[in-house]
Regions:
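Specific aromatic-rich, kink-prone transmembrane helix
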Residues: 70, 110-130, 281-285
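Membrane-interface alpha helices of multi-pass inner-membrane proteins
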Residues: 116-121, 128-141, 146-153, 262
């Protein structure tokens, strides 16, 4: 939302005295600050007022592009043909939520990149890469944390290594949070723990629950991540359940994303952005349905 964007813009300009729920999502504002310094000489004086928004856009554009690349590799690993995998990337990139998180001064693009990186490395059983990346991924956004436990559900992953990495990562998380808090004047010690963020979201989420799920605007928000592809994905899931097409097999660990996404949707005042985290599950099922429809059409022809 607008409040989120204003907070991140302030952070990129060195102001940490903002809402605690935004204060610790430091990576993208930090990168936007670096980009702003790099491109400032290239911007004419009459356009300098746009430099903050442009800096965020360039950072988010790169991150979203990386998310699209990892999504393509993820879909290839699920045995989709290159053209179908590319279609899945276009579904992701064409989503209203992806466009908003890329074009606005937001940090959600890094959240979606973190999700697809985690599930891709889980699928390809890259224990060491997961171990090395977890300390960085945990700093992206609080909502990334549950996804970091997904590798523990897989017997083929080195769980001891992942547990060690998680232990180090949480130590780094709270250390970084304490450093950020130390830069904020007149902040109480009880204000910055991660539980404050959860409590704040829970309070606002429950207050807006009826508006989110029992109003026209709320249904629009729920529909916005994947629009018609929600329905197509449900058809794809039905195809798998009925074993009409057994060529594709969606890994079971991905279904844990469902409670994560819907749980965060309840906590958040913007359920669309939270439900968009289902894209590693929704897009493959949508592609299964599309592949089935296209193959049936070819048989008729």
């Amino acid at each position: 939302g607008l409040g989120d964007s204003l907070s991140y813009l302030a952070m990129s300009n060195g102001d940490s005295d903002i809402a605690s729920i935004h204060r610790y999502r430091i990576i993208i504002p930090f990168l936007a600050d670096l980009v702003r310094d790099a491109i400032r000489p290239l911007i004419s004086s009459d356009q300098l007022h746009t430099i903050d928004a442009l800096s965020f856009y360039l950072v988010n554009y790169l991150i979203t592009s990386l998310a699209g690349l990892f999504l393509y590799l993820f879909l290839i690993e699920l045995k989709f043909k290159p053209e179908r995998s590319l279609m899945g990337v276009f579904i992701f990139l064409g989503s209203r939520i992806t466009i908003l998180s890329t074009g606005a001064p937001m940090v959600d693009s890094l959240y979606y990149l973190a999700i697809i990186v985690i599930v891709y490395f889980c699928l390809t059983q890259r224990s060491m890469l997961l171990c090395l990346l977890t300390p960085l991924l945990i700093l992206t956004k609080e909502t990334t944390v549950p996804f970091l436990f997904l590798p523990l559900l897989l017997k083929t992953i080195n769980r001891k290594l992942i547990l060690l990495s998680l232990s180090v990562s949480f130590a780094i998380l709270f250390w970084v949070r304490s450093l950020v808090t130390a830069t904020v004047p007149n902040v109480s010690k009880s204000e910055h723990p991660i539980l404050v963020t959860i409590t704040s979201h829970l309070s606002s989420g429950l207050d807006s629950l009826s508006q989110s799920y029992f109003s026209l605007a709320g249904w629009h928000d729920l529909f916005s991540p994947f629009s018609v592809f929600w329905v197509i994905a449900l058809f794809g899931a039905w195809i798998e359940i009925k074993k009409i097409d057994t060529y594709y097999e969606i890994p079971r660990f991905l279904f844990w994303i469902i409670p994560f996404a819907f749980g965060f949707a309840v906590l958040s005042s913007n359920s669309g952005r939270m439900l968009h985290s289902l894209f590693p599950l929704v897009i493959p099922y949508a592609l299964i349905a599309i592949d089935y429809i296209m193959s049936r059409k070819q048989l008729k022809d």
